[in-house]
Structures are given as C-alpha cells and as structure tokens.
C-alpha cells in the first residue's frame, strides 16, 4: 500500500471536484450535532474537512468524533469550492483512517506561558505562528544562498571546531581535543573563508556559530546561524553595495513566497515593501552626533520610552542607541568606520585615521538592531601581525592566517549576517528565540 497521500494540501486548488486522499495531523476539531469539522494540516497548508453524518458510515463518523488534537490520519473525500475558506475550498469527507490517536496533547488551545512553551519547543513548532516563522526562516536561508550563487560565490565550508579565537577570547566555548589541548566552538567562519577567497575569488560559508556571552536580551543566542561571504579585490563600498542587494533580494523573496505566513504573524508588510537599494549610510562620527542631539532634545527609545542615554566618542552602541538611530530612517541603516578599539583585530584601518577601521554594521528598522557586521580586511601581513599582538593573541596560533597575506594578498572584504536576527525582523517577532527551531540561551539547553 502506498503511504504517500494523493497530493499535498497546497497543491489541491487545481483538483476541486476530484476525490483525493490527504494525510496529516488534526490541528483543531469541533463538533456540531451531525457535523464534525476537522482542521487538517500537512505541513504545506491547513484545510477544513467536513464530515456529514448522513454521507459516511457509522464507523467513519465514530472515527471523526474519536480524533483528538495532533492525531495523525488519512482523510479521503472530495474537494469542494468554498469562498469562506482561506484556501478557497474544503474537503467533503468520505473516509478516515487513523494512524495514531494522540492522548493528552500538552499544548492545548488555552493560553500558555513562555516557560511552558519553551520546555515543549519540540511540540510548539507545530503551532501556526511558529510554523510560519520557521517557513520564513527556510526562505531566508534559501534566498541568501540563491543570491550569492547567482553572483558567482562558491560555498566554502568552515570548521566548527577551531584551535584559535576569531573575535576575542572572552566568549569562547572550550572543549578538550584529545592530546592537543583545547578546541573551541567557532565564533565565526570568516578567517577560514578568507583562504577560500584566494582560491575561488568569491566564497561564503553557512553554518552554526557560538558565543559564550552571558546575555539574556531578546537579541542574543549562544548558538546561532551565520552566512558569511568574502570576496577579493573589494573595498568597503563594494561590501556595502553587495549587502544592500543581498538583503533586498531576501526581503523580496519573503514577500513573494511567504504571504500567508506573514498574514498569520500579522506582519505589516508595507514596512518591508520599500526595502530596496540604496540604504542610508552614516559614519560612526555622525551617529554619535545624532545621539547627542537626541539626548539634548529629550529623545526616548521604543518600546519602553526610556530616555536615550548619552555616549562619548569611542563607546560602542547599545541596543537602545541602534534602535534610536534606525528610527531616523525607513530603511536598514549602515553605520560605518567605528573606533578601532571596539572592533576585531583583522579590520583595515581607515586611510589617514588609524583610530577607526573600515567596517560597517547594518541596522534593521523597527528596533531589530544589527543584522550584518562587515569590514574590509587587513591585507598587509606586518600590520595584521601587529594587530594580533595588540589584542593579546598568540601570533603562533595565527601563522596560517598570516600566510594568506604572505602569498598573493589582495584587498578584500566580507560580512556576516545572522539568520535569526534577519528572520525576527522580517517576521516581526520581538524575540530571537522564536526564529530558530531549538534556541540555545544562557539558561536554556533543553530540549
């Protein structure tokens, strides 16, 4: 016997009037006398299945009444047009085959707290909003790779276990590596991807990255996914232009492919429809000045309307500062040329201003903060070695990385985009933990 259904719900529109066999899970069920209404989901869509007692055998009607939330089943019937349905059709049921009858499903239609839902994350992902979020995530990942592939970037996988730090030593997860000492979970794939840049010219890696930050904010996870392009003969302006086109492509893909998901999430898509190049750009110096002007004017920051805190030149921005600066524009905002002391060792100094580096953060609108960090990389071996020493790192650990500057070095640039932050912004969800199937946080590693 074939186990596959005759079609998936999403493909049913062209088969109205035909007899079909659908397979899935009971999302919701209501009974009204001689009628049973079953909301059946199969992962592609949800359809209403109507069981008329007069149209089925007593056994089939009994099975319909027996079904419980999240029971799995096959449902046979005829597709019928119905303007009231979000799909435009529903299923008149003729037969039901129960695969598994669920008992006491823990996530009932009543309201549940976040703690409870996170402890049942393996089941919560079945709910409509979580399903929509994760479909958007899948489209973001697909679009990101599709765009880079179309621009002649080659996927170049980087290791998860590394011998050295890439962004600093304070937030590394360490593990023993046989007799060779400690290995670390990768903070980024960038350093390794730079080796591929000299091989293919344009490369990217995609995978999980790890930060042992003791942070409990809605923007932070200890494990998150990054896509990190790197390309040769490219400066900071080339880098920002690539990011503009890259992000705009992803946004359009989500608008085109996730219309129903965005509706489920009640996302105001008008705020996404104008995300097209060029994006506004301001320097770090200009950003500090705008913050000082905001403080002087008594500016407050959403969502709590807390007073905007002052900053001095050389300070890094906190989440409220990013939110305030982004609120001054209606598109993602580039802030470029940050102070050297707040950025990583591998960033190229600005010409004539060694106190700043040629980098840029891309800040999403609506308070979602930084979604991309990028820079032009140092391509001079002596300068790079000096920067490694300044950051208190062991030069011996980076000889392989310095080799990339000793043999055919060229100006090059790259960036990293956090998938979860991008998904949270596009979906309009306030907490990053819902933008990944199984979030890892300071106080959560289960399930």
UniProtKB/Swiss-Prot annotation:
<dbReference type="GO" id="GO:0004816">
    <property type="term" value="F:asparagine-tRNA ligase activity"/>
</dbReference>
<keyword id="KW-0963">Cytoplasm</keyword>
<keyword id="KW-0648">Protein biosynthesis</keyword>
<dbReference type="InterPro" id="IPR012340">
    <property type="entry name" value="NA-bd_OB-fold"/>
</dbReference>
<keyword id="KW-0547">Nucleotide-binding</keyword>
<protein>
    <recommendedName>
        <fullName>Asparagine--tRNA ligase</fullName>
        <ecNumber>6.1.1.22</ecNumber>
    </recommendedName>
</protein>
<dbReference type="InterPro" id="IPR045864">
    <property type="entry name" value="aa-tRNA-synth_II/BPL/LPL"/>
</dbReference>
<comment type="subunit">
    <text>Homodimer.</text>
</comment>
<dbReference type="InterPro" id="IPR002312">
    <property type="entry name" value="Asp/Asn-tRNA-synth_IIb"/>
</dbReference>
<dbReference type="Pfam" id="PF00152">
    <property type="entry name" value="tRNA-synt_2"/>
</dbReference>
<dbReference type="GO" id="GO:0006421">
    <property type="term" value="P:asparaginyl-tRNA aminoacylation"/>
</dbReference>
<dbReference type="InterPro" id="IPR004365">
    <property type="entry name" value="NA-bd_OB_tRNA"/>
</dbReference>
<dbReference type="InterPro" id="IPR004522">
    <property type="entry name" value="Asn-tRNA-ligase"/>
</dbReference>
<dbReference type="InterPro" id="IPR006195">
    <property type="entry name" value="aa-tRNA-synth_II"/>
</dbReference>
<comment type="similarity">
    <text>Belongs to the class-II aminoacyl-tRNA synthetase family.</text>
</comment>
<dbReference type="Pfam" id="PF01336">
    <property type="entry name" value="tRNA_anti-codon"/>
</dbReference>
<dbReference type="InterPro" id="IPR004364">
    <property type="entry name" value="Aa-tRNA-synt_II"/>
</dbReference>
<dbReference type="GO" id="GO:0003676">
    <property type="term" value="F:nucleic acid binding"/>
</dbReference>
<keyword id="KW-0067">ATP-binding</keyword>
<keyword id="KW-0436">Ligase</keyword>
<dbReference type="GO" id="GO:0005524">
    <property type="term" value="F:ATP binding"/>
</dbReference>
<keyword id="KW-0030">Aminoacyl-tRNA synthetase</keyword>
<dbReference type="GO" id="GO:0005737">
    <property type="term" value="C:cytoplasm"/>
</dbReference>
């Amino acid at each position: 016997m074939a186990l596959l259904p005759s079609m998936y719900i999403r493909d049913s529109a062209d088969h109205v009037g035909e007899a079909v066999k659908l397979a899935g899970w009971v999302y919701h069920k209501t009974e009204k006398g001689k009628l049973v209404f079953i909301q059946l989901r199969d992962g592609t869509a949800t359809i209403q299945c109507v069981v008329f007692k007069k149209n089925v055998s007593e056994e089939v009607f009994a099975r319909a009444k027996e079904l419980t939330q999240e029971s799995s089943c096959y449902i046979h019937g005829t597709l019928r047009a119905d303007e009231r349905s979000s799909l435009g059709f529903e299923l008149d049921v003729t037969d039901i085959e129960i695969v598994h009858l669920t008992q006491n499903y823990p996530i009932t239609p009543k309201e549940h707290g976040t703690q409870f839902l996170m402890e049942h994350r393996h089941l919560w992902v079945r709910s409509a909003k979580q399903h929509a979020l994760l479909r958007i995530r899948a489209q973001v990942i697909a679009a990101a790779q599709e765009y880079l592939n179309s621009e002649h970037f080659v996927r170049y996988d980087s290791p998860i276990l590394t011998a050295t730090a890439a962004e600093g030593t304070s937030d590394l997860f360490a593990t023993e590596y046989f007799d060779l000492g400690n290995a670390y979970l990768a903070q980024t794939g960038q350093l390794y991807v730079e080796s591929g840049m000299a091989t293919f010219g344009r490369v990217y890696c995609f995978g999980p990255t790890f930060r042992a930050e003791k942070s409990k904010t809605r923007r932070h996870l200890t494990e998150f996914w990054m896509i990190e392009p790197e390309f040769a003969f490219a400066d900071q302006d080339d880098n920002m232009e690539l990011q503009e086109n890259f992000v705009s492509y992803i946004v359009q893909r989500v608008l085109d492919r996730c219309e129903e998901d965005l509706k489920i999430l009640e996302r105001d898509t008008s705020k996404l429809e104008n995300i097209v190049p060029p994006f506004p750009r301001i320097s770090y110096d200009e950003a500090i000045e705008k913050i000082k002007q905001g403080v002087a004017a008594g500016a407050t920051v959403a969502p709590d309307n807390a007073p905007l805190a002052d900053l001095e030149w050389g300070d890094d921005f906190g989440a409220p500062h990013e939110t305030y600066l982004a609120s001054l524009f209606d598109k993602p905002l580039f802030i470029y040329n940050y102070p050297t002391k707040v950025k990583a060792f591998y960033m190229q100094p600005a010409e004539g201003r060694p106190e700043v580096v040629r980098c840029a953060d891309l800040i999403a609108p609506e308070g979602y903060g930084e979604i991309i960090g990028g820079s032009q990389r140092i391509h001079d071996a002596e300068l790079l070695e000096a920067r490694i020493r300044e950051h208190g790192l062991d030069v011996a650990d980076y000889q392989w990385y310095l080799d990339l500057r000793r043999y055919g070095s060229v100006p090059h640039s790259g960036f990293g985009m956090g998938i979860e932050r991008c998904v949270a912004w596009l979906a309009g969800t306030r907490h990053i933990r819902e933008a990944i199937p199984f979030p890892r946080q300071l106080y959560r590693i289960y399930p």
